[in-house]
Amino acid sequence: MPRLSQDNQQGHQKHFSRPSRRIQFLPPPWTEAYNVNVHQTVENEGCATAMHNVKLLGSPAAPTLLSLLSGTLSGFARFFALLLRRPPPEAPLRRRDFSALIPALPAAVLSPGHEERPGRLSLLLRAALALPGRPPGGRLPREVDASAGQSSSIPPMGSEWMEMRKRPVCAAQEPTACAPGQPGVENQGSNACCFCWCCCCSCSCLTVRNQEEQRLRRTSYEARTEDLPTCEESPGPTLEEASAWAQSFDKLMLTPAGRNAFREFLRTEFSEENMLFWMACEELKKEANKATIEEKARIIYEDYISILSPKEVSLDSRVRETINRSMAEPSRNIFDDAQLQIYTLMHRDSYPRFMNSALYKDLLRSLSEKAVEA
């Protein structure tokens, strides 16, 4: 590194040998008082960390900077102090509208000595009295007064309304279920358990309903069979004849004795009208007079085809439509399709049960005993 010249070295030493000319700015006396005031203000505002031993810079701008900082800090301190003191905001409460309940409340429900309270207090009081519960008097407002024989006029609400709807039904069933000395009380006592439908319990009301339907069906059948024609007049069957019925259904239907025995069995199954309809169709085929054919066809239609008849037979819609179109000009064969359908029904459904019935077996036993005695 090249060395400095002698002139430069002398100038350098002369420059550094001069006394320092920097001006030492001392803080004025009023800044110390301001420092004390700032410390007291921060402590009074409740700040957790007070500023102790604040040192001012030795500059003319230090007081201005300090005043700005102290003002800002004191403002923040006041702001956070207010936030800590303020309670958290609450969610807005939803007000109920009890205006519909107020007209239903009688003035007598209010306790004596209480006057009408205006405004919100009156609304709350009326709403509380309208709710179901026990009032301070110790008696429900809708309870029947035993001494006066009168009940309150407050309308029932909620589940109480459902209970009141059930009471008339239960009251109507109690005389038949609980009256002593009547026949069938043992069976009906358990039938009053409930009268409302419930999907999770099995109630004996269904059993009572089925028994009632069977009783009505039996009564209706007995009423409609009062005007039925009597059985065909025929001699009693022989053992060989009765045994031939088991060979085929046609052999059973060919003999009057077989038809009478089969008709008696159908009567026990409440389906005697099938045999009567088949026999009426056979009688219609024997007629030759047009007026007689029309009259008998009309009678057969009203007795066995019409949906209003208690002796209606079971036919499909196609056969019914064919008969309805042909009733304008009926003929002897107007019911052939319906007769064949009923014949097939008796053959497939009733005939096998007749062969296994006690009626047919008893008939064979009695005929066998007569044959042995002879």
Swiss-Prot record:
SUPFAM superfamilies: Regulator of G-protein signaling, RGS. Residues 1-21, 135-158 are annotated as: Disordered. It is a lipid-anchor. One of its GO terms (biological process) is negative regulation of signal transduction. The keyword Nucleus applies. One of its GO terms (cellular component) is cytoplasm. Keywords: Cytoplasm, Glycoprotein, Lipoprotein, Membrane, Nucleus, Palmitate, Phosphoprotein, Signal transduction inhibitor, Ubl conjugation. Residues 248-364 form the RGS domain. Retinal-specific. Expressed throughout the retina, including photoreceptors. Fatty acylated. Heavily palmitoylated in the cysteine string motif. Disulfide bonds: none annotated. The keyword DNA repair does not apply. It is found in: Membrane; Nucleus; Cytoplasm. Residues 1-11 have a biased composition (Polar residues). Residues 12-21 have a biased composition (Basic residues). Inhibits signal transduction by increasing the GTPase activity of G protein alpha subunits thereby driving them into their inactive GDP-bound form. Binds selectively to G(z)-alpha and G(alpha)-i2 subunits, accelerates their GTPase activity and regulates their signaling activities. The G(z)-alpha activity is inhibited by the phosphorylation and palmitoylation of the G-protein. Negatively regulates mu-opioid receptor-mediated activation of the G-proteins. Forms a complex with G(alpha)z/i2 subunits and mu-opioid receptors; the formation of this complex results in mu-opioid receptor desensitization. Interacts with OPRM1. This is Regulator of G-protein signaling 20.
